[in-house]
Amino acid sequence: MARIGDGGDLLKCSFCGKSQKQVKKLIAGPGVYICDECIDLCNEIIEEELADADDVKLDELPKPAEIRDFLENYVIGQDTAKKTLAVAVYNHYKRIQAGDKARDARGETVELAKSNILMLGPTGCGKTYLAQTLAKMLNVPFAIADATALTEAGYVGEDVENILLKLIQAADYDVKRAETGIIYIDEVDKIARKSENPSITRDVSGEGVQQALLKILEGTQASVPPQGGRKHPHQEFIQIDTTNVLFIVAGAFAGLEKIVSDRVGKRGLGFGAEVKSKADIDTTDHFAEVMPEDLIKFGLIPEFIGRLPIVASVTNLDRESLIKILSEPKNALVKQYTRLFEMDGVELEFSQDALEAIADQAIHRGTGARGLRAIMEEVLQPVMYDIPSRDDVAKVVVTGETVIDNVLPTIVPRKPSRTERRDKSA
């Protein structure tokens, strides 16, 4: 117990024995005292124990095959992209658990560098959804940012640090947790510079943004304004280390297929070359053959490409895939709308030709999987307006004719109960 020292009336810490003159603060309890230094030490011990408890052990980290199987439950097709992402994500979090360092067979320390991901492919093919599903499986903070809203520091628009603020907000302002999250930057093809040659004028929303993103992609200690917006000198900043943040950068890259085609086509010159028509070549096949030189020609700077070593490409969804997307995944659209109708006590049914017609419309509109919900809304909107006000409907059946000819779905009336028949006859 803390007592008055022999040399005078000085109080002492009950834990370390230091007098009140040797410490900044001495806090009194019932018969005991504790100094500020002992409090700090206790806090450090508690934080270390909590961190150890929160860390996912290596044997608990899902293996690439398990990650791919999980994605299969939610995303139809894109098998190559799933495997690429599964391996990349597994290696990324394995690296974090090793503390950025690992020892080889000779006991020497090996630095493990971060590998961010570049996703290429047409709109509506599942790029964003793949990243969202990954974050959901791993239970890590996830943030989506739009590259088109970003500008170089000092110009009207968002600073790149605002991307990090979204991640911190997704982690409920737990910075330590945010530092192992995933950031998905969409529409990155829209920040390509106008020419593959460096510009002498400022390109504040193109090359300037790429330059600004370099540091956070690679890993840096960033200062983030807690309320967003521009930085100003009287504002306190949140410090976040992006070394262990996984960046998935994506875009449709319209026009890149021509650059790849021109490069690949040069190999086929000469009398013995195989001649292919444009109809024989699927544009999405070209994304699988993308090289850094193609991305530089498109308008990405070499330093930016160098920080995105893993390339995953998604392909256009065919008719069969779109039909599967409507009904097979765990949260398929048909299942979602069926549940909505069940809440009103009505059964909803889609015929096979209705699903085929919805898929055909999505292909015709060129919207991919993203357009399926809009078509479903158009088809079901009249009955969704009418059904809640009625109690005589048992079932709604959507057929191919409903989708193609824009006619109302078939409504199956509910048979009156015995009590209702008795009341009516009375």
Swiss-Prot record:
<dbReference type="Pfam" id="PF06689">
    <property type="entry name" value="zf-C4_ClpX"/>
</dbReference>
<keyword id="KW-0862">Zinc</keyword>
<dbReference type="InterPro" id="IPR027417">
    <property type="entry name" value="P-loop_NTPase"/>
</dbReference>
<keyword id="KW-0067">ATP-binding</keyword>
<feature type="binding site">
    <location>
        <begin position="122"/>
        <end position="129"/>
    </location>
    <ligand>
        <name>ATP</name>
    </ligand>
</feature>
<dbReference type="InterPro" id="IPR050052">
    <property type="entry name" value="ATP-dep_Clp_protease_ClpX"/>
</dbReference>
<dbReference type="InterPro" id="IPR010603">
    <property type="entry name" value="Znf_CppX_C4"/>
</dbReference>
<dbReference type="Pfam" id="PF07724">
    <property type="entry name" value="AAA_2"/>
</dbReference>
<keyword id="KW-0143">Chaperone</keyword>
<comment type="function">
    <text>ATP-dependent specificity component of the Clp protease. It directs the protease to specific substrates. Can perform chaperone functions in the absence of ClpP.</text>
</comment>
<dbReference type="InterPro" id="IPR046425">
    <property type="entry name" value="ClpX_bact"/>
</dbReference>
<dbReference type="InterPro" id="IPR003959">
    <property type="entry name" value="ATPase_AAA_core"/>
</dbReference>
<dbReference type="GO" id="GO:0051301">
    <property type="term" value="P:cell division"/>
</dbReference>
<protein>
    <recommendedName>
        <fullName>ATP-dependent Clp protease ATP-binding subunit ClpX</fullName>
    </recommendedName>
</protein>
<feature type="binding site">
    <location>
        <position position="38"/>
    </location>
    <ligand>
        <name>Zn(2+)</name>
    </ligand>
</feature>
<dbReference type="GO" id="GO:0140662">
    <property type="term" value="F:ATP-dependent protein folding chaperone"/>
</dbReference>
<feature type="domain" description="ClpX-type ZB">
    <location>
        <begin position="1"/>
        <end position="54"/>
    </location>
</feature>
<feature type="binding site">
    <location>
        <position position="35"/>
    </location>
    <ligand>
        <name>Zn(2+)</name>
    </ligand>
</feature>
<dbReference type="InterPro" id="IPR003593">
    <property type="entry name" value="AAA+_ATPase"/>
</dbReference>
<dbReference type="InterPro" id="IPR038366">
    <property type="entry name" value="Znf_CppX_C4_sf"/>
</dbReference>
<dbReference type="InterPro" id="IPR004487">
    <property type="entry name" value="Clp_protease_ATP-bd_su_ClpX"/>
</dbReference>
<dbReference type="GO" id="GO:0016887">
    <property type="term" value="F:ATP hydrolysis activity"/>
</dbReference>
<dbReference type="Pfam" id="PF10431">
    <property type="entry name" value="ClpB_D2-small"/>
</dbReference>
<feature type="binding site">
    <location>
        <position position="13"/>
    </location>
    <ligand>
        <name>Zn(2+)</name>
    </ligand>
</feature>
<dbReference type="GO" id="GO:0046983">
    <property type="term" value="F:protein dimerization activity"/>
</dbReference>
<comment type="similarity">
    <text>Belongs to the ClpX chaperone family.</text>
</comment>
<keyword id="KW-0479">Metal-binding</keyword>
<keyword id="KW-0547">Nucleotide-binding</keyword>
<dbReference type="GO" id="GO:0009376">
    <property type="term" value="C:HslUV protease complex"/>
</dbReference>
<dbReference type="GO" id="GO:0005524">
    <property type="term" value="F:ATP binding"/>
</dbReference>
<feature type="binding site">
    <location>
        <position position="16"/>
    </location>
    <ligand>
        <name>Zn(2+)</name>
    </ligand>
</feature>
<dbReference type="GO" id="GO:0051082">
    <property type="term" value="F:unfolded protein binding"/>
</dbReference>
<dbReference type="GO" id="GO:0008270">
    <property type="term" value="F:zinc ion binding"/>
</dbReference>
<dbReference type="InterPro" id="IPR019489">
    <property type="entry name" value="Clp_ATPase_C"/>
</dbReference>
<comment type="subunit">
    <text>Component of the ClpX-ClpP complex. Forms a hexameric ring that, in the presence of ATP, binds to fourteen ClpP subunits assembled into a disk-like structure with a central cavity, resembling the structure of eukaryotic proteasomes.</text>
</comment>
<dbReference type="GO" id="GO:0051603">
    <property type="term" value="P:proteolysis involved in protein catabolic process"/>
</dbReference>
